[in-house]
């Protein structure tokens, strides 16, 4: 079984207009209550073209680190250190809080258009980095190391560094749009190439993230 470390789960919850009680949340007493509940190091409010955003970073809820929380008029962006269960638990606590501070209790049964997820992690695989690109390309690049040297006293080496793909979406509904997401499977920066430690970012929740990586390793001829 693969050992996923440094996992971060992120989600964007997109709501119909006038669902989120942002005006209520911007009240000092409610902001302070939220800051206390999540042990945030600080909360700030930004205004851009008459649109307010509440931004909080680095907190904790029930032992789960919360990396970021951003709330605007129609969406909640939440990132926690952990898996989908940790993310969902944090969201539910937030949703109940937003329900309680709103006399209309709109977040009790919110009109949620869609939720998009992202998960990142580091994981050791039995796949050499070079296997991610065509052998012809690696052979060509390595044949040019002499001309890539800045001077005769240096030795140039070429290693794979970054590898990302863009995932585009076309929603079935026309009331909202989705921005493209990034799918990344690349060498983890600062690690020994011999260890084959990868940084992986997928536009999915953590369960699918794990499944994609496991199937990727099998497809690339790793551990059977």
What residues fall within each predicted segment?
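C-terminal interaction module
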Residues: 1-45, 126-224
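Glycine-rich, often proline-containing surface loops adjacent to acidic residues and nearby aromatics
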Residues: 3-14, 67-84, 113-122, 191-194
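Short, surface-exposed beta-strand/loop "edge" segments at domain boundaries and coil↔beta transitions
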Residues: 17-22, 61-66, 84-91, 131
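Short, intrinsically disordered low-complexity segments
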Residues: 40-85
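Noncatalytic linker/hinge segments flanking ATPase motor cores
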Residues: 49-57, 119-124, 163-170
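Short amphipathic beta-strand starts and helix->beta connectors
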Residues: 61-66, 101-107, 183
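Non-transmembrane, amphipathic alpha-helical segments
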Residues: 82, 86, 201-204
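Surface-exposed beta-loop interaction hotspot
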Residues: 83-147
